[in-house]
Amino acid sequence: MTAVTRIILKLSATTGVGFAGWCLGKFSEQKRHLNADIKNSGSHIISNVNIKEMPGLPLFGTVSAAVPMEVDTNMGSKLSSTATRVSEINSIKRFTFITFIIMKYGFPGLDHVRSYEDFVLSYDRRNRVAHWVFEHLNKDRLQPNKEISRSKCEFKPDPSIHPFFRSENHDYKGSGYDRGHLAAAGNHKCAQNHIDQTFFLTNMAPQVGVGFNRDSWNRLEKYVRHLTKVYKDVYVCTGPLYLPKIEANGKKYVRYEVIGTNHVAVPTHFYKIVVGETYDSKLEMEAFVMPNTPIDDNVPLTNFQVPPESIERAAGLLFFDKISRDKLSKINGKNVR
């Protein structure tokens, strides 16, 4: 294993998937171009460089930071000679080495991405709730299983989260808020451990009970499950929002309650973005924002549909960023093209 590979793997442990994946991907791309040239030309210009094949890091490309790192996608075609490519690899080595030296004693923190058996989330350690939770649903995965019981599940903290940043059950006790699921328990009944994991407090957020979590939010969750009868596959991203409000002085403020000794944030709103893939491979998107307040059950869910971009701006995230908007056939039930 080369020094640069060790550095990249070290970075993967400290910086998270996104940055390390970019470094390794960029390095691997140039290595492939270089090896192809050597094979074709018989050159041994880097015979003294011990570069081994490594699998790429799995990247979770469906949700990303709103300001992505710029990468030249035409880099391969611009590098016209083997020598230039060797130089490029050396520059990547220097880049990763310098970063490693600067951050020798660790990064203060990056998004904590947690992959469970049947869903993935990004945990917000400051607010003690998730930034987003991502699910993949289809008709087969939602088939009822008599051996699966919600009554066996217990709300519990995720031990993988540092104790400084966890929410605990006592934070919710007496708060007046429900421990509201982001990845709905009803979406994960194909195995007991799948539904069990939806009860980790990392998947919870303080939600108003009567009129919201137990009613209108539940209606939205049931609607999403219904979509598995319409689409071949359904992809769901759910999370909290903390939206500004105009106050008496005419200025906008972001104000939200915190509960418990761990100061768990109470979101002002929740979003849910859904992409359905049809049997003929068309993609359709729906986006919802609901206030964390009691909602009349007679209000149609379509009243809460919003442009997806409005959620992205408010959340500081780009959702389904591997899908160009012009590839969608419908957004919120309306034809895009």
Go through each PLM region and give its residues.
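Domain-level detector for secreted/extracellular nuclease and nuclease-toxin modules, and
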Residues: 1-337
